[in-house]
Structures are given as C-alpha cells and as structure tokens.
Amino acid sequence: MNQAMKLDNIMAFIKETNTESIEDKNFIFGYIEPKFSKYLLFQAGAVADLKNFLVFFTNEEIILVELNHSGDFTGRINHLERKKIADFKYKSGLTQTKIIFKYDDIRLVLKTPQVVLTSKWQMTNLKYLKEKNFFWK
C-alpha cells in the first residue's frame, strides 16, 4: 500500500521504464477530479472516479503514471507530447496548485497539493519545477 509515494520505489520505477530523461526532482503527485455532474448524480461513485497520478515533466513530454486509490502503480502510463499541448496555465494557490492545459482538444485540470504528508519530496519537487520553469519550456 502507498508504494508509489516512496522515493526509492519511484526511482526503481524510472529505471524499469528506461526513461532516462527523468531526473530525481522533475515529478509531482497530482490528481484529476471527476466532472461536477458525476457528483450531482452519485457522490460515492464520483469519488471512485478520482484519478491519481505521478506526473513527470521532461523536455519532450509530460508523462502521467496512473496510481490506484491505495497509492500503488497500476501500470497505465500516458505520454503527452509537448507539441500537442496547448493553452498551458499554471495556478499556484495556498494549499494546492492547478495545472490546466489542452491535449488533443481535451481540457485537463490536474490538481496537486502543495504538501503530501506521506511524501516529503512533493514540496521540494514543486519548488524545483517552479524555479526551473519546467512546467512550460
């Protein structure tokens, strides 16, 4: 349980997937909430539709590695080419950051907490990505 939130396991996962362009600080934890209409229809079902990700930023792409609700790797990986990303916005709030962009005309709102209690690397990595302007190169 919660294996994908441990730094050693993340580094092992990077080696397994042979993604050499990933550094040790250019990833964060994030999630995509279900649409508001799902909350109106069936609240408990909407919570189950929440998608958790480890989000890796490279020069060529954004990689979304899906996690289950227990915080373990599911094996599903999405590679989003930076060439196909449009309308990229980054909004930093007090408790969470929103990364909003369009990919193939689909609007994605990725939310990421400023602090994750089980992952001390979250705040450090967010700060690193902001300083290096890695969210949009």
Where on the chain are the PLM-derived regions?
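Phosphoinositide-binding peripheral membrane targeting modules
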Residues: 42-54, 58-100, 107
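A membrane-cytosol interface segment of integral membrane proteins
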Residues: 130-137
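Short, surface-exposed, charged/polar-biased interaction segments
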Residues: 31-35, 83, 106, 129
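Anionic N-terminal interaction surfaces
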Residues: 1-55
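Short flexible/disordered coil segments
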Residues: 17, 82-96, 119-129
